[in-house]
């Protein structure tokens, strides 16, 4: 009995299914092997240690850390930088003289080791101050202080308010130079006018007062100063700071009064005056007709044809020469004399 056509067809289908279930194509095997190899390599990469560098003798991971002047610091922000031995994030922080500060709003600047906002603050000699504001403000520094040059003066590195029509400084004080004087280093004297003047630290009117050794005193008639006091030149003399009653012929000889008719004042010494000795020679009186005064010493002219002074001595110029202040005899000239 021969198999039918339907039976043969069924056998072919069954044989085809069996072949498909138990066959392994070579290209599929190659793909699976390649996938396994890549997975192993990826795992090996994840497990490999990160490269390390040295910073001051200490190893660090450059992916998470950075070396700042020999100090290992963490990386902060997207573009970290070093501030001396510290790391910082320049997008939110500032490095001011080696110190990390949070960046302020506005125009961020450094004032010494601190950060400040230049829109609202001002740095004066390393000190952060509030900046002067207003439509007419002229902000600036006065020493270590902030001031407004439109309404203030800077007096001795200190801000003071402007006063009057001619504001000026008197030490650390402000004053109106049209109505006051600055006397001494910092004293404001409230005097004015063409006769206003200073007497030490005080102001005074020169029409009514005198300044005697920094003392302001009422002015007497024909008044003048004698030391620290006033006196009347009508009735008194002032002899080197000493007041003396004024006589008809009284004069001063140092701090002493003397009669100018019968006395002489010779180099601060009162000596008798006579018709024979009417003038001074040093601290004594002498007669210029009969005597010669040489360096404060009186010599008689007797015996000299042409009496002449040579230093502190007298000599006869007809028989000698004066060589270097010494009378020298029997020489034609002083040349060659030692």
UniProtKB/Swiss-Prot annotation:
Region: Disordered, residue numbers: 30-50
Tissue: Component of the acid-insoluble organic matrix of the aragonitic skeleton (at protein level). Initially, expressed in an aboral submarginal ring and then along calcifying septa.
Residue ranges the record marks as coiled coil: none
Keywords from the UniProt entry: Secreted, Signal
Localization in the cell: Secreted
GO (cellular component) term, any one: extracellular region
Pfam family, one: Galaxin_repeat
Covalent S-S links between cysteines: none
UniProt feature, compositional bias: Basic and acidic residues: 30-47
Main location: secreted
Signal peptide: 1-23
Cross-referenced PANTHER family: GALAXIN-LIKE, PROTEIN CBG12054-RELATED
Protein name, per record: Galaxin
């Amino acid at each position: 009995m021969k198999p039918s056509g339907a039976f043969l067809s069924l056998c072919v289908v069954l044989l085809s299914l069996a072949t498909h279930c138990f066959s392994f194509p070579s290209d599929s095997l190659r793909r699976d092997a390649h996938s396994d190899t890549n997975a192993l390599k990826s795992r090996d990469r994840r497990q490999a240690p990160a490269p390390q560098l040295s910073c001051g003798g200490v190893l660090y991971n450059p992916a998470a850390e950075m070396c700042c002047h020999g100090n290992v610091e963490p990386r902060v922000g997207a573009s970290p930088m070093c501030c001396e031995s510290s790391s910082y994030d320049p997008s939110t922080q500032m490095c001011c003289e080696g110190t990390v500060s949070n960046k302020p709003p506005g125009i961020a600047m450094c004032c010494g080791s601190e950060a400040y906002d230049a829109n609202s603050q001002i740095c004066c000699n390393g000190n952060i101050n509030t900046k002067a504001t207003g439509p007419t403000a002229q902000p600036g520094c006065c020493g270590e202080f902030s001031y407004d040059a439109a309404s203030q003066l800077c007096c001795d590195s200190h801000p003071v308010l402007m006063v009057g029509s001619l504001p000026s400084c008197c030490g650390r004080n402000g004053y109106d130079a049209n109505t006051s004087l600055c006397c001494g280093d910092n004293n404001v004297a409230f005097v004015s006018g063409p006769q206003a003047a200073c007497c030490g630290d005080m102001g005074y009117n020169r029409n009514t007062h005198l300044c005697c050794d920094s003392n302001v005193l009422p002015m007497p008639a024909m008044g003048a100063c004698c030391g620290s006091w006033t006196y009347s030149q009508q009735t008194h003399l002032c002899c080197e700071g000493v007041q003396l009653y004024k006589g008809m012929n009284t004069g001063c000889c140092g701090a002493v009064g003397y009669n100018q008719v019968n006395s002489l004042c010779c180099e601060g010494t009162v000596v008798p005056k006579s018709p024979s000795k009417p003038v001074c020679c040093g601290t004594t009186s002498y007669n210029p007709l009969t005597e010669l005064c040489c360096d404060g010493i009186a010599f008689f002219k007797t015996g000299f044809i042409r009496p002449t002074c040579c230093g502190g001595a007298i000599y006869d110029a007809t028989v000698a020469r004066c060589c270097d202040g010494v009378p020298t005899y029997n020489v034609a000239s002083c040349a060659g004399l030692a």
